[in-house]
A protein has these predicted regions:
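Loop/turn elements at helix/coil->beta-strand transitions in domains of secreted/extracellular proteins
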Residues: 88-92, 117-121, 161, 168-169
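Positively charged n-region of N-terminal signal peptides that target proteins for export
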Residues: 1-6
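N-terminal leader/targeting and pre-domain segments
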Residues: 7-15, 21-88, 189-211
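C-type cytochrome heme c attachment motif
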Residues: 98-105, 162-165
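Short active-site neighborhood of thiol/selenol oxidoreductases, capturing the structured segment around
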Residues: 84-100, 110
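Thiol-based oxidoreductase modules, predominantly thioredoxin-like and allied folds used
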Residues: 67-77, 95, 119-146
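Typically the conserved alpha-helix immediately C-terminal to a functionally engaged Cys/Sec
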Residues: 102-117
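Non-catalytic, surface beta->alpha helical segment in thiol-disulfide oxidoreductase systems
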Residues: 154-211
Length: 211
């Protein structure tokens, strides 16, 4: 009987200790969760792309479904900042739009390449924004001279997105426009890519950024 009481007492003590330890660990986990902060730009980038998941555009085309990591390294820039970064900084620049089907088809693969290469910042310019700046024409002319945009027959600027640039010492050392994969039969540009197409995109972006 005495030994049974000892066993029960020991088990009770171990139970109390276990509860205390578990409680402490849960508190620390909650504290760590609360202290995690994600940049507003990363959250906005995720939202802007994912909010169109499964939605139809004005032509009835359905946007593919994306899952963007909330800790992505995106930093939004305006048109003037974009030109200044190209002229003066060492950096990587992504020019795109959430409504561009080719951009949506390749953005997850781009972010995977960025993660694999441990790239901590991607400057992001979203086209169709910043057209109301006072020096818009001057800025776009400079981008045209750098062959980042083109002027169409109707005198409107064309970006050829998605565009990926890497700059160093004020020079563009790598540039990718558009996509290089081919669509399969019955595959729409709005559809997600197959594994072979993803590999083509991955290798293209990896080679461009691994310099």
């Amino acid at each position: 009987m005495k030994s049974e009481k000892i066993v029960i007492t020991v088990l009770g003590i171990l139970l109390v200790i276990s509860i205390i330890v578990i409680g402490y660990l849960m508190i620390k986990i909650n504290e760590n969760s609360i202290n995690i902060e994600y940049s507003e730009d990363a959250i906005m980038f995720k939202y802007n792309y994912e909010r169109l998941n499964g939605k139809k555009n004005s032509d009835g085309n359905v946007y593919n479904t994306l899952s963007i990591a909330i800790n992505n390294p995106i930093k939004y820039v305006n048109l003037e900042e974009l030109v200044n970064i190209i002229d003066t900084e060492d950096g990587i620049i992504y020019i795109s739009s959430p409504t561009c089907p080719y951009c949506r088809a390749t953005v997850e693969t781009l972010l995977q390449v960025v993660k694999d290469l441990n790239i901590s910042k991607i400057y992001y310019y979203e086209i169709f924004t910043g057209n109301d700046v006072a020096n818009y024409d001057e800025l776009m002319k400079e981008l045209e001279e750098k062959e980042i945009v083109k002027v169409n027959n109707d005198s409107k600027y064309s970006w050829g997105v998605p565009v990926l640039l890497q700059t160093r010492n004020g020079e563009i050392i790598s540039k990718i426009n558009g996509v290089s994969y081919e669509l399969e039969e019955n595959q729409s540009k709005y559809d997600s890519l197959n594994e072979e197409q993803k590999e083509i995109v991955y290798n293209r972006y990896y080679d461009a950024l691994n310099k």
